[in-house]
UniProtKB/Swiss-Prot annotation:
Taxonomic placement: Bacteria, Pseudomonadati, Pseudomonadota, Betaproteobacteria, Burkholderiales
Name of the featured protein: Large ribosomal subunit protein bL25
Keyword rRNA-binding annotated: yes
PANTHER family: RIBOSOMAL PROTEIN L25/GLN-TRNA SYNTHETASE, ANTI-CODON-BINDING DOMAIN-CONTAINING PROTEIN, RIBOSOMAL PROTEIN L25_GLN-TRNA SYNTHETASE, ANTI-CODON-BINDING DOMAIN-CONTAINING PROTEIN
ATP-binding among keywords: no
Cited function: This is one of the proteins that binds to the 5S RNA in the ribosome where it forms part of the central protuberance.
Single GO MF descriptor: 5S rRNA binding
NCBIfam families registered for this protein in UniProt: bL25_bact_ctc, PRK05618.1-2, PRK05618.1-5, PRK05943.1
Domain of life: Bacteria
Keywords: Ribonucleoprotein, Ribosomal protein, RNA-binding, rRNA-binding
Length: 214
């Protein structure tokens, strides 16, 4: 995926504000042996690119001044309540150096699992992405989590899934082995009210109205 940016000569809060007012987004590129470079990008093109899953989990071709470099999206900031990208960070990548990144999870075969079809279980997705390590050439767009054999009362853990070739779990994820999805039977609904009228309450005996005269 190609991203076009331009080198930015002016920095600072005021300069960034003017940049945003002109329809641009400030950013930075860092990493590798080259110095960090401040850049600007067309806001609308960037905003729509950020809506694509592949933009978050792909090696991007960042073109600056006619030269292209391989980068990863590392971070971006959005306005609290406006559809406005305030800032974006890219990291340069080397073809021979592994990178760590969170990759989206795609869950499959939940509807065909025995837990759902035969036992009426509900599948809950506990995680939506997984942090892994890989060389840039092996970057997966997503990682598939097959739920066909999930069992009620049990979960699918990170170490249970088949990772794409060249992709490994980072150390702390492998040690923690988090749950990615689980299956459970829904709680029984409260009993429905019946149409049978309730029996009338017993009536207390009437007090004796006879007065005793002494």
């Amino acid at each position: 995926m190609k991203v076009v940016a331009f080198e930015r000569s002016v920095q600072g809060t005021s300069a960034s504000r003017r940049l945003r007012n002109s329809g641009k987004t400030p950013g930075i590129v860092y990493g590798s042996k080259d110095p960090a470079l401040v850049i600007e990008l067309d806001h609308n093109a960037l905003f729509h690119a950020l809506r694509k899953e592949a933009f978050h989990s792909s090696i991007l071709d960042l073109e600056i001044g006619g030269k292209t470099q391989k980068v990863l999206l590392r971070d971006y900031q959005m306005h609290p309540f406006k559809p406005l990208v305030l800032h974006i960070d890219f990291q340069r990548v080397s073809a021979t150096k592994k990178v760590h990144m969170r990759v989206p999870l795609h869950f499959t075969n939940a509807d065909t699992s025995a837990a759902v079809k035969l036992q009426g279980a509900v599948i809950s997705h506990i995680a939506t992405e997984l942090e892994v390590s890989y060389l840039p050439a092996d970057l997966p767009e997503f990682i598939e989590v097959d739920l066909a054999k999930i069992e009620v009362g049990h979960g699918i853990h990170a170490k249970d899934i088949a990772l794409p070739k060249g992709v490994t779990l980072i150390l702390h994820v492998e040690q923690e082995n988090p749950v990615l999805a689980n299956a459970r039977i829904p709680a029984v609904k409260a009993a429905e009210p019946t149409d049978t009228p309730a029996a009338p309450a017993a009536t207390a005996p009437a007090a004796d109205a006879t007065k005793v005269i002494i």
